[in-house]
């Protein structure tokens, strides 16, 4: 298997149509619930192996992902890379932070892995946590890139298993809001 297709996402109920508030606060007519895609451990492992293969040349020593969406895929990427640790960040008082005793060693080479990238805001927050702790971010990976950019983190290496072009809007400019379509908040930041 190379990458992931929209048909695969649809088949497992992970591609949703409607009116959604994304974690970034923006609105969209489509939502990718990667947790449903990753609910099958074999599928999660395969996705982790694929993403790891695309990022192996970064020679990472650590994978860091934001909770909640990035935890499964980040763990699977770390496992596939072998001899690589996995940490996750969490929000505390609105700020992304390391907790649970996770400590980044100065100079460690870290990949940041996420489930879906739209604006890249959460990913950049994780990158800031890593660099503030003295680590070096050496690449970024995601299951889905819906940012509209080939590499939203250039010049760092970036890999995604699925790239889609789905418009997203500021709430004030959302045509779905104007039409009165009910808004659903399916993400981890509701």
Please tell me what each predicted stretch does.
Residues 1-190:
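PRPP-associated nucleotide enzymes
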